[in-house]
């Protein structure tokens, strides 16, 4: 179980260089398109491999397209976002709660940019590292360990910045 977070209007910094693979990518479309699975199923195994490779590289080159975390990593990250954003209404309580449930919480472009700014500021100020130490001390005896790491915070900040808003699926 994980959280799939899709940019609603992502910044595209680089298109795939491989024309054939790019054609496959455009033909199949996005995971949330109604006919995605049908188009995916019709591909040959070779084309599925090409699609997967180009899709992965495209997402790495354009961090606002897609962010993923398993539930163990997502919960402390989303809780930290809430901690930084709850006081002045950047996020609503409903968005925060929906963000933990794969229920399609929608975060608009303005909110996404504010989240990115706050996360990057928290990294720069050393607050993320302080939070990590306190979080680990507070949860060291918990039966389940949910990791919290600065590199995950940074990856999410980069995603938010380039996402154009996002949907948590």
Sequence positions of predicted segments:
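Acidic (Asp/Glu-rich) sequence patches and key acidic residues
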Residues: 1-169
């Amino acid at each position: 179980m994980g959280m799939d977070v899709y940019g609603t209007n992502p910044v595209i910094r680089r298109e795939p260089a491989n024309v054939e693979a790019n054609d496959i990518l455009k033909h199949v479309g996005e995971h949330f398109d109604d006919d995605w699975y049908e188009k995916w199923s019709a591909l040959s195994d070779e084309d599925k491999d090409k699609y997967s490779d180009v899709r992965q590289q495209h997402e790495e080159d354009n961090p606002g397209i897609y962010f993923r975390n398993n539930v163990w990593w997502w919960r402390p990250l989303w809780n930290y976002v809430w901690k930084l954003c709850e006081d002045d209404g950047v996020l609503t309580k409903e968005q925060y709660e929906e963000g933990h449930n794969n229920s399609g919480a929608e975060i608009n472009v303005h909110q996404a940019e504010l989240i990115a700014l706050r996360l990057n500021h928290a990294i720069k100020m050393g607050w993320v590292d302080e939070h990590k130490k306190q979080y680990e001390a507070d949860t060291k005896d918990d039966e389940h360990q949910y990791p919290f790491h600065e590199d995950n915070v940074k990856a999410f900040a980069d995603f938010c910045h380039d996402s154009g808003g996002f949907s948590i699926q």
